[in-house]
Amino acid sequence: ARGANGVIIVTTKSGSEGKTQVNFNASLGYKKVSKLVKTMSPYDYAYYQYELGSTDYGNYNDLDIWKSIEGRDYQDEVFGRTGNQKQYNVNVSGGTKDLKYNIGFSHNDEKSIMQGSGYAKNNVNAKINANLNKWLSLDFNGRMAFTKLDGLNGGADTNESSAANSVVANTVRWNPVEPLSGTSDDDEENSTSTRRNPTERITDTYKYQERFQQNYNVGLNWKPFKNITFRSEFGYGWKYNNTDQVWGSNATTNSKYGYNGQPQVQFVRLENKNWRNANTLTYDNKKLFHGRDHINVLVGQEWSSSQDVTRTNTSVAFPTSFTLNEVLANTAAGTALPNEGNIKAEENILSYFGRINYTLNDKYLATFTLR
């Protein structure tokens, strides 16, 4: 890999010679918010509004009524549930002197503390090392990962015209009780006449993500002479990130797309393809000057290519009576905005590199790198 300090070699877990071994691990955990941010009581909030000159919560003589009113704790409503996490892992390894393998599968499943949020992830890893003869060896490693995410995952709501109006921020900022008049003279960001409380917004928002990634690498090592090794490796990767999101009428009161109060839907498709080829020649002599010194010289070249593709489809102005499922099932019932697409130019890199390590008497080390 490219690095500021030269060539960096990254290795993964390999198999070992011996009988086939199967290992299985499982764990279960629970999570819950340990401490919430302290917010105003209904009385404190009503009194604060009165001091600001608002009469939406009654006259001064009526403010004591709010002492007996139980306000809503939006932090508890949004983050109050008990989450859990389950993990499973199975690994198979073994091999002979000339063939070693290591294959693993893991599954993570989480119900998050945030209402409507969670994820599931599956990973498959494989690594194989084979000695074809005394001059040639082959190694292969592959990895596949598939992830499903539900919910806003931290409160991000890309439909909002202002990031400050996120669900997370408003669990702390939102008024604990509604004004007597049903409307409020608060600032626009917290105005109940144009906004919806965090619980309404999160229950009227649907977000589902799928992420898939696969990477494969194969390498061939050839040792034609003593102390000299030639290695050629090739890697290929492909991944996508798909997001489906629907905002119901309670989640579009401050939409950046306009059409406030009308359901909206957006589909985002991200894709990346990449490949890499590297060829290196290494000279390694541990018995230089009758074993006093050790020299390692590596030269090589690498080229790689990567390309990103993004597509976004958005539809707005669905009937206000539509539920989230009805929007997903009838996307043609809305008004389609112009499609957004971006096919980036391929990013191609060709490079040459070299490294020299010289050890003197196992005490002094000199290193030279160039790329």
Label the predicted regions.
Residues A1-N25, Q85-Q87, K100, S106-N108:
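A beta-strand signature from Gram-negative outer-membrane beta-barrel systems
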Residues A1-G6, Y30, G71-G83:
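Periplasmic N-terminal accessory/gating domains of Gram-negative outer-membrane beta-barrel systems
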Residues E233, G300, I349, F353-T359, ...:
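Exposed, low-structure sequence patches enriched in small/polar residues
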Residues D98-Y101, W135-L138, N227-F230, F289, ...:
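Repeated loop/turn-to-beta-strand initiation elements of outer-membrane beta-barrel proteins
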Residues E17, Q85, T96-K97, N133, ...:
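Outer-membrane beta-barrel channels and translocator barrels
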Residues T12, V90-G94, A126-A130, V218-W222, ...:
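Residues on the lipid-exposed face of transmembrane beta-strands in outer-membrane beta-barrel proteins
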Residues E17-R72, S112-S117, N123, K127-N215, ...:
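Surface-exposed loop/interface segments of Gram-negative outer-membrane beta-barrel transport/assembly proteins
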Residues A26, F105-K111, A366-R371:
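Transmembrane beta-strand segments that form the barrel wall of outer-membrane beta-barrel proteins
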